[in-house]
Structures are given as C-alpha cells and as structure tokens.
C-alpha cells in the first residue's frame, strides 16, 4: 500500500498537553478501526500550528474517511514517492 504524508493545520498544536495528545491518539486509533483494514496510522509530528501525519493506506479516500470519523482536518495529502536518508548518498534509494 502507498505511504502518505497528511498535513493538518491545527492552531496552537504545540501547546497541547500530554493528556490532550493521548486523547487525540485514542480518537485516531478508534477512527482507524472504524475505517477498516485499508489504513494504518504510522506516526505524527506536531509543530506549533500543524501536524504532519504518516499513514499507509489504499488510497486518499480512506484517509479522508478516517479524518471525517475522527473530526480531523485534512489540508493536504501527499503520496510518498521515495525515501532519502544519509545512506542514500551511497546509492540506496528506497521506494515504498
């Protein structure tokens, strides 16, 4: 399945408490269960006003379904085309 990066604009995200982040993670886990086998939440990176979420999913539609179930915004969805890291300099380019 393809891997995606989802951008979510959520003002004041950086000020969320650990308890709030835990609650959001539970909501996301529940939404994944409801959306079905075609989606997996990998991880999310929280910045001051945005979230960057990594998902493996059959397509963008199920990502939007997950967001609707959980009440999360979806400002952009980008399919990952390749992975580049320090080892890539030696010719080891990874593709999902």
Q: What would you call each of these model-derived segments?
A:
Residues 1-34, 40, 48-50, 85-96:
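Short S/T/G/P-rich N-terminal loop/turn motif that feeds into the first structured element of a domain
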Residues 7, 43, 79:
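Acidic-residue sensor for enzyme active/binding pockets
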Residues 9, 44, 56:
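Acidic/polar N-terminal loop/beta-strand segments that form early-domain functional surfaces
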Residues 37-43, 76:
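A short linear hydrophobic-aromatic micro-motif
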Residues 43-52, 63:
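Amphipathic, hydrophobic secondary-structure cores in small proteins
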Residues 56-83:
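An amphipathic, aromatic/His-enriched active-site/gating alpha helix that lines ligand/cofactor pockets
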